[in-house]
């Protein structure tokens, strides 16, 4: 079963994952996209190991070259911006998009590993 298949449906068309449901290292074929700004990515909250920084404003332009068959997990500080990014990917035709509920705040609260 893929990570996407195990995730919970969200009414916006993507799926939701809790920090405990996101395995690190990431399974093959899963891309973790952090949509925060560069200073947040390396700041106090750090980032999930394996995450790629793609600030929210640049997601539509960068997603043009992404593999639409891959699974994507979007993350931000609290889940709001990543939810917007997930919704944008769904509208652009991506079929396997997930949002990390609670973002890096929830990730840190769960005591999970981060990088800076």
Residue ranges and their predicted role:
Residues 1-30, 38-72, 80-116:
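Rhodanese-like catalytic fold shared by cysteine-dependent sulfurtransferases
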Residues 75:
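Short, surface-exposed ligand- or partner-binding patches at beta-edge/loop junctions that are enriched
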């Amino acid at each position: 079963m893929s990570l996407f298949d195990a995730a919970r449906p969200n009414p916006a068309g993507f799926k939701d994952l809790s920090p405990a449901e996101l395995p690190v290292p990431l399974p093959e074929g899963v891309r973790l996209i952090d949509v925060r700004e560069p200073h947040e990515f390396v700041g106090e909250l750090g980032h999930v190991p394996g995450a790629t920084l793609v600030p929210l404003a640049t997601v539509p332009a960068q997603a043009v070259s992404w593999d639409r068959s891959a699974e994507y997990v979007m993350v931000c500080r609290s889940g709001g911006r990543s939810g917007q990014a997930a919704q944008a990917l769904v509208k652009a035709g991506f079929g396997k998009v997930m949002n990390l509920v609670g973002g890096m705040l929830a990730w840190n609260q769960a005591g999970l590993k981060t990088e800076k």
